[in-house]
């Protein structure tokens, strides 16, 4: 009897999606603050709707930041250069409501900048997860990798003129047929590909479908995963001219599954963008990913999840958990011991070990097309730490 397979789906959205626009603005603000002041405390939220972008939150920094310029530059770089594409970066209203970090939080977390790195407490309570799987070279779920890469490719063909009819907003979704091999995930084929892209008035639905197949799907999805039974839904609504903030309101932190593992593993609920590294929602999730990825890359397991938890003002995590889904070469308790020996989960030390206080255009890169599985030197949490285990006991 043939082994039983199952279907699993992951989605992604483009940099022109209104929620993702907000993530990018929030991280552009963070980058600008950190570039001038590495100890900036940033909690920056962004909201957008027709003809308006607003940034709000709590920021304590020595940096001089032109928030309006950051908003307009970010929107322009995405491609929002006129009302008909969903937003005009140079004419839209920009509202700013930024205050300083609460002194109550400041004294509890970093002692008003007096605590040494190893003493810095978590910026809040919370739970964070890291996940990794051996099904792709990135050690990420294939369904998520393909959905994300389709979105990135859609933006590429828009910006380089290959498909000049494409507008900034767009969504992708990929269903993969999997085999469960004793807890490890083995992709068999791509079952369904869905792309909905904003487009201009000039293009027909037939042209859209042909261009998407030729210039987006073919370069991204390996031929071995496609067959005559693969289903394609290409702009199934039939019309997607109105998009961006004109089509939908946008808000920072509403695409947290797209940012992480596409529905695989687990998520603690905390968003990443617009948060400096004392916010463990971000730094904790980054170090948990590094731990999970290192477990897989070191051959300790084929798939695993790592959970950590924190209390506000307390440096050490309250708990660390590892589950290898039965794929571990050694017992999970042994893997957990290795993780605790090799990773420092104190927020101040995460910032140092992953170099998370460096700004520039560092974090804006994370704000579209996923925070994990990326091949970029700035994604320091993707660097594998070799975990040595006693082969004799394995």
Swiss-Prot record:
Keywords: ATP-binding, Cobalt, Cytoplasm, Magnesium, Metal-binding, Nucleotide-binding, One-carbon metabolism, Potassium, Transferase. One of its GO terms (biological process) is S-adenosylmethionine biosynthetic process. The keyword Transferase applies. It is found in: Cytoplasm. GO terms for cellular component: cytoplasm. K(+) binds at residue 45. Homotetramer. One of its GO terms (molecular function) is metal ion binding. This is S-adenosylmethionine synthase 3. InterPro entries: ADOMET_SYNTHASE_CS, S-AdoMet_synt_C, S-AdoMet_synt_central, S-AdoMet_synt_N, S-AdoMet_synthetase, S-AdoMet_synthetase_sfam. Disulfide bonds: none annotated. Binds 2 divalent ions per subunit. The metal ions interact primarily with the substrate. Can utilize magnesium, manganese or cobalt (in vitro). Binds 1 potassium ion per subunit. The potassium ion interacts primarily with the substrate. PROSITE patterns: ADOMET_SYNTHASE_1 (PS00376), ADOMET_SYNTHASE_2 (PS00377). The keyword Magnesium applies. It catalyses: L-methionine + ATP + H2O = S-adenosyl-L-methionine + phosphate + diphosphate.
